[in-house]
Amino acid sequence: MNTAERRNEILNLLQNADAPVAARKLASQFGVSRQVIVQDMAVIRAATPGILSTTRGYV
């Protein structure tokens, strides 16, 4: 899975989630480091209004 595909999947997961999703959980699910997820989320949040970062995860 390339970066763009991973980011699209993350966005899909967040849009369908009922609760905040932790970066640690996303990292495990996609087989990447938490830092990669943090970087992905910075790009996703810049391009997608309404995505928030909380102490419990992303919503």
Where are these regions (language model features)?
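Intrinsically disordered, low-complexity sequence elements enriched in Ser/Thr/Gly/Pro
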Residues: A4-E5, V32, V43, T54
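Extreme N-terminal segment that seeds HTH/winged-HTH DNA-binding domains in transcriptional regulators
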Residues: M1-F30
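Key DNA-contact positions within bacterial/archaeal DNA-binding proteins
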Residues: Q35
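HTH-adjacent hinge/linker in prokaryotic transcriptional regulators
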Residues: A42-V59
